[in-house]
Amino acid sequence: MNLHEYQSKHLLKKYNIPVPASEVVFNPDAAVDAAAKIGGDRWVVKAQVHAGGRGKAGGVRLVKNKEELKSAVKALLGMRLVTYQTDERGQPVNQILVEQTSDIARELYLGAVIDRASQRIVFMASTEGGVEIEKVAEKSPEKILKVTVDPAIGLQPFQCRQLFFGLGLQDLKQMRSFTDIVMGLYRLFTERDLSLLEINPLVITGSGELICLDAKINIDDSALYRQSELREMRDTTQEDEHETMAQQWELNYIKLDGNIGCMVNGAGLAMATMDLIKLSGGDPANFLDVGGSATKERVTEAFKIIVSDKNVKGILVNIFGGIVRCDLIADGIISAVKEVGIDVPVVVRLEGNNAQLGAKKLADSGMNIIAAKGFADAAEQIVKQVGVIA
């Protein structure tokens, strides 16, 4: 789950991490009130969307008076902001962050992520603040400093100092402030079950202070059951509606750009299915894992989600029956196809417990359901069917 910038900064303040004074607003008049509360005669207006690249897309604006402020907020609210991280439809702007300006002398990058290889939290820092860290990693990986956290003892102050001096910084007052910030970020990361945390940029002001000018936070979805405060911060308007619907039924769904819908039980089998579709000359329209218990209800909802994508011209169902019998899965598929009213070809490959009986039920159903003879045959059949339609 992703948080908006204003929500992320709200969390940072709870951990005594310095951020600029700011207010989130939902209309132009509230923006004027927010500016009066913040003070000053210039402000930064930031569109709140779950995507990077806002500045280049016109979603971050510097305003020099309250008339410009109202005009900027009015222009941004309600629009769909298109950045390099969104699709062509963009993300809806429903909130605006009005923030005090900062006297920026230097921009740094600071982030933390769970490294799957080492199974540990890794903190990263770079002198290349204010730009996409992915570009830095690609072009100048030597400019990214890393420290790995031992989970038995946690992040240590000496590791913060390693990053500080590695950035070419020397001031002892700044070192203490930097250490406090990084240690606070570590507590935030572990206590709130984060999977990604980025401060980009972390700025050094003209007076030598360190301030977190922007913040990005991703939360581990699997831990939301114990993070009730964060769970309430979810903004479903920023998420794909298909993925939101899938989460309600505990289905793992990711939309792709192809035209062959996939329904599979098991993430590994789902990825192998997508690979085989691609190898056979097709393009998968989604990743969809119905999980180990492919009940009739979940299969029905999975079909509804798949066919709600207008690009889908055919569906491949690939189920391995272990504990769940394939004949019962076949009953669920037939019932779901009838209920949803699917008018595109459906190819089903069943393997495992009672697979032959399940295939017979599909063949005898009288519906537009093709029982495949094997894994490769299933991929070839659906690609062929979609090719005929195209």
UniProtKB/Swiss-Prot annotation:
Listed EC numbers: 6.2.1.5
Cofactors required: Mg(2+)
Protein residues bound to substrate: 265, 322-324
GO molecular function list: ATP binding; magnesium ion binding; succinate-CoA ligase (ADP-forming) activity; succinate-CoA ligase (GDP-forming) activity
TM spans (from-to): none
Enzyme type, top EC level: ligase
Pfam families xref list: ATP-grasp_2 (PF08442), Ligase_CoA (PF00549)
GO CC terms, sorted: cytosol; succinate-CoA ligase complex
Positions of disulphide bridges: none
Record pathway: Carbohydrate metabolism; tricarboxylic acid cycle; succinate from succinyl-CoA (ligase route): step 1/1
GO biological process: succinyl-CoA metabolic process; tricarboxylic acid cycle
UniProt-listed InterPro entries: ATP-grasp (IPR011761), ATP-grasp_succ-CoA_synth-type (IPR013650), ATP_grasp_subdomain_1 (IPR013815), Succ-CoA_synthase_bsu_CS (IPR017866), SUCC_ACL_C (IPR005811), Succ_CoA_ligase-like_bsu (IPR005809), Succinyl-CoA_synth-like (IPR016102)
Top-level lineage group: Bacteria
Domain called ATP-grasp: residue spans: 9-245
Subunit-structure text: Heterotetramer of two alpha and two beta subunits.
Functional summary from the UniProt entry: Succinyl-CoA synthetase functions in the citric acid cycle (TCA), coupling the hydrolysis of succinyl-CoA to the synthesis of either ATP or GTP and thus represents the only step of substrate-level phosphorylation in the TCA. The beta subunit provides nucleotide specificity of the enzyme and binds the substrate succinate, while the binding sites for coenzyme A and phosphate are found in the alpha subunit.
Protein name: Succinate--CoA ligase [ADP-forming] subunit beta
Organism: Coxiella burnetii (strain CbuG_Q212) (Coxiella burnetii (strain Q212))
Phylogenetic lineage: Bacteria, Pseudomonadati, Pseudomonadota, Gammaproteobacteria, Legionellales
